[in-house]
C-alpha cells in the first residue's frame, strides 16, 4: 500500500467509534488491552513517561525530549494532534516516522484487527502504530502524551514508569465530565499501582485524585515554590529561576531570600509564556531523577522548537500562531499578549470547533477589546463555518459588533495586514489561534507543506 492510501484509511477511521464506542468505556478499554496483547505488548519493558493534562502536554513532552536527547539518550515522543503532517505525531530522536514505517505498522495492526473482527478509531490505531515503531527503534525513553483524559485513553494500555499531569481545567466536558473532580479522576487514571506521579497545579481536585491513586507524588509548584519567572519580550523567551529551599531564614520574605542568598539556577525556555514554567518544572524534576545536569538541561532547551506555541510566524507584520483552543489556554495566551501589547493593538484570527465552549472562549477575548476575524473550519471534523459560530455567539447574547466574519482565513489575514499597514494604525500584531486545525489551515494557505489534517 502507498502512504496516501493508508492515511486516507486512517483518517476515515475518525467516523468509527468517534473516540468512545457504544460499549462502556471499560469494555472499550478491555478491547484495547486485548489488541495490545495480540501485538505482543510493544514497549512493555521500556522507560515511559506518560503525560496527561488539559493543556501543556505537548510542551512538557517536548521539554523532556530535548533534555534527554541532549543527555545522550535515544528518545521517542508521541503527541497529538499534528499541524502539517501525520508523521509529526511519532518521533524518534527528533525525526519523524517515515512514510514506509507508517504503512508497515498500519498493516501489522490491521492484520490483527481483521483476524479478530475488531474495529478501533483514528487515535487508537495511531497509538498502536507509534508503540510498534518505538519498540522496533529500541529507544531509551518514551514520552507518551494522552489523547483525551487518561483512564480510558488508548495510550493507557502501557505500563509507564512515571506519570505526569500538567493541569486540570474544563475541556471535553461531554466526554470527561462536567466537574473538575471528574476530569481530574480521568487524568489521574494514568497512574499505575502507586507509581510516581509528578504534577504542576495547586488544585485540590487534582491533588485528591492523585492521592487516590498513589502515595508517591510530587507537586512541583510546591517543591519549587521559590520560583521567579520573567518574560524576555525582545526574544520571545521565558526565563525561569529556581531557588533552593534549604538554609533560608523563614522570617524573611521571598524577595529578601532571593537577593540575600542568590541560590538560583537560571534556565531560558525557548517558548514564550509564564505558564510554560509549570510544564518545564515537570521536565526538570524528571531530568533530576535521572541525574541530568543543569548544563545539559539548558543545552536541551536551547535546541527546542515547537510549532503553534506562541510561534512567531512573521516579524513584519508581527504574526503569532498559537494552538490555544479552550478557556484556560486562551486565558494564558491573553496574559502573554498583555506583556507585549495594549488591548487595542492586537487583531485575532480564529475559529473554534463545535465541541468547545465557544461563549466562554470569546468572552475572554472580547473583554480585551481586540479586533476579531472569525473564519471557517467547516472542512474538518467538528468544525464550524464563520456563520455558525456567529449564531452560537448570538444565542449566548454576545455582541458581535467588533467581529468580522470571513470564512477564508487567507482573506482574513490579508485584511488584517492591511489594517496594520494603514497610516497611523493602532494595530501592531496579528494572532492566529483557536485550534490546531486553524494553524494547519493557515500554514497550508501560506505556502507551508501540508498533508491530511
Question: What do the predicted segments below correspond to?
Answer:
Residues 435-453:
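Glycine/aspartate-rich loop-and-adjacent alpha/beta segment that forms the canonical ThDP
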Residues 1-53, 60-62, 66-71, 78, ...:
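Short functional linear segments
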Residues 198-201, 213-234, 269-274, 296-303, ...:
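Beta-strand->loop->alpha-helix junctions that form or flank phosphate-binding loops
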Residues 136, 141-146, 153-164, 168-172, ...:
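Nucleotide phosphate-binding/pyrophosphate-handling subdomain across enzymes
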Residues 20-26, 36-44, 70-158, 170, ...:
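ATP-dependent carboxylate-amine ligase catalytic core
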Residues 150-151, 159-213:
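Conserved catalytic-core segment of NTP-binding enzymes
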Residues 64-69, 134, 365, 393:
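Hydrophobic alpha-helical packing residues
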Residues 203-213, 318-319, 362-429:
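C-terminal helical cap/extension that packs against the catalytic core
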